[in-house]
Amino acid sequence: MRYVKVGSDGSGGSRFEEVEVGQVETAYTENTPPVLVSRVIPATGLAWVTLPPDVRETGWHPPPRRQFVVILEGEFELETTDGHKRRFQPGAALLIDDLDGQGHVTRVLTGGAASFLAIPLAE
């Protein structure tokens, strides 16, 4: 299992990175067969975020905090300062961690509202 990290490059820019999620076989709950489970990442909350139909692009921005994002509705494109662009559809998980510098651009590629879960991290 993987997620995409949008991180700072150390010189005020941002870049994409593929991150492998380590999992171990665990009896996750009683009376069920073992499943693969990752370590728990401490979070401080959860917010549903919706970009209304008239918001198609954000411009360059850093995130408000270090957070995981899970796409719920719509197709998003993120662009990093190194010129790379990636598209993300519902179900995609991203770690948005480019707190330093210019950040990234977010675009909505589909019509209508687009939404994601923002999960601020405690660490």
What are these regions (language model features)?
Residues 1-8:
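Short acidic, Pro/Gly- and aromatic-enriched capping/linker segments at domain boundaries
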Residues 9-10, 71:
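Short, acidic, Ser/Thr-enriched surface-loop or helix-capping motifs
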Residues 13-60, 114-116, 122:
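A short glycine-rich, His/Asp/Glu-containing loop-to-beta-strand
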Residues 21-22, 50, 81-99:
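Short acidic-glycine-tyrosine-enriched beta hairpin
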Residues 27, 86, 102-108:
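Short, Lys/Arg- and Gly-enriched loop/turn segments at beta-strand edges
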Residues 60-62, 104:
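Histidine-centered active-site/metal-ligand motif
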Residues 62, 68-89:
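A short beta-strand-loop-beta hairpin characteristic of the jelly-roll/cupin
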Residues 93-99, 105, 109-123:
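A short hydrophobic beta-strand segment most commonly corresponding to one strand
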